[in-house]
């Protein structure tokens, strides 16, 4: 059959011809909401010019001691020392590479489709950045947000008479989360001179707090019929008298390539971490933790993404991402980890 433009138009009109193209205004891509990620929300990010180095730690006991004394006649008081020591960090380089098949890409470009399909470099760069967020959250959870990391660790129990280093789970109606957190804050203030200002909570903890009777009682008169009171992160932060509450909502697929998906929250959904940490690196403030980020190119970009061609004859090209972090616990006494909150 001799196919002409007119015959194709006639087949399209009859619905017999379906052109092999893709929609340009829709595609499905499970990129997560940026607000779900938590790795850089609790602890300050310190950009460093070397992959490893030292930093000073001044002795807490010396700084918080009263060094003043009554001056003796014709004499002087003894000089007061402030001791210090150094700790180290070491950023390890992680890498992600994605490929582009130029022959396959030719077909995709001719089929039209959305811009991301026609511009694979942009799509690969975005995917690398997205999975960098997932990787950073996994590093954070491994370094800071699980049992056995912090000296100050408490365990939730169903009993209304908790023992030492135990507390009543928030799913128990007899619990009082507001007083519990207030007591923890006061204990840290007594030991360090710093009151916790941030708290990271798992997804199930957030859900339990939002529906806890003691918290609902505090906010029930704050709304109206058209705009009922809601327990949000900001409301919880105000009730707990904290600068910020970070809800750990990011997820990842823990299954290997080719296996059935195993979706799960990255941060322990049943835990919380109460900390003191400044918003930015400081030379006269302590912090429970720091995220050291190596500026390997020296241009301020801590996630450099580059493009290069594949070997001759492969008709391929690659997009590469690099990053180097050390997520380090820097002050054990400025954090309290609570597991099994629900």
Task: Give residue ranges: language-model regions.
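Surface-exposed flexible segments
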Residues: 42-49, 210-222, 278-309, 333-335
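Oligomerization/assembly interface segments of phage tail-like spikes and tubes
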Residues: 93-100, 317-323
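Alpha-helical scaffold segments that mediate packing/assembly in large oligomeric complexes
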Residues: 104-195, 203-221
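Assembly/oligomerization interface modules of large self-assembling protein complexes
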Residues: 32-99
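Extended oligomerization regions of viral-like shell subunits
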Residues: 194-291
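Protruding loop/beta-arch "assembly-hinge" segments enriched in small, turn-prone residues
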Residues: 1-29, 33-41, 47, 301-342
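A binding-site-centric feature that preferentially detects glycan-recognition modules on secreted/surface proteins
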Residues: 117-127, 131-133, 218-219, 234, ...
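Intrinsically disordered, low-complexity coil segments
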Residues: 11, 105-120, 152-166, 171-175, ...
């Amino acid at each position: 059959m001799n196919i002409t433009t007119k015959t194709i138009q006639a087949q399209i009109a009859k619905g017999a011809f379906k052109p092999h193209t893709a929609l340009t205004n829709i595609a499905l891509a499970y990129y997560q909401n940026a607000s779900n990620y938590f790795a850089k929300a609790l602890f300050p990010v310190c950009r460093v010019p070397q992959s490893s180095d030292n930093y000073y730690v001044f002795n807490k006991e010396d700084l918080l001691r009263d060094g003043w004394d009554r001056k003796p006649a014709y004499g002087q008081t003894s000089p007061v020392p402030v001791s210090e020591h150094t700790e180290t960090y070491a950023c390890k380089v992680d890498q992600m590479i994605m490929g582009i098949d130029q022959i396959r890409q030719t077909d995709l470009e001719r089929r039209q489709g959305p811009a991301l399909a026609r511009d694979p470099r942009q799509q690969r760069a975005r995917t690398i950045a997205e999975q960098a967020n997932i990787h950073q959250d996994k590093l954070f959870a491994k370094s800071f947000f699980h049992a056995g990391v912090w000296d100050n660790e408490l365990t939730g129990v169903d009993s209304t008479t908790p023992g030492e280093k135990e507390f009543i789970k928030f799913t128990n109606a007899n619990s009082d989360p507001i007083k519990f957190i207030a007591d923890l804050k006061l204990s840290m203030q007594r030991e360090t001179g710093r009151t916790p200002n941030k708290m990271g909570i798992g997804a199930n903890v957030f859900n339990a707090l939002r529906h806890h009777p003691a918290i609902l009682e505090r906010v029930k008169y704050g709304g109206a019929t058209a705009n009922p009171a809601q327990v949000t992160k900001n409301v919880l932060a105000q009730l707990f008298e904290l600068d910020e509450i970070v809800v750990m909502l990011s997820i990842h697929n823990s299954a290997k390539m080719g296996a059935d998906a195993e979706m799960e929250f990255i941060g322990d959904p049943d835990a919380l971490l109460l900390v003191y940490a400044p918003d930015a690196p400081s030379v006269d403030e302590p912090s429970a933790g720091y995220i050291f980020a190596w500026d390997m190119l020296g241009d301020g970009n801590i996630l450099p993404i580059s493009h290069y061609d594949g070997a001759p004859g492969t008709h391929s090209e690659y997009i590469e991402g690099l990053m180097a972090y050390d997520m380090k616990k820097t002050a054990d006494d400025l954090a309290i980890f609570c597991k099994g909150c629900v």
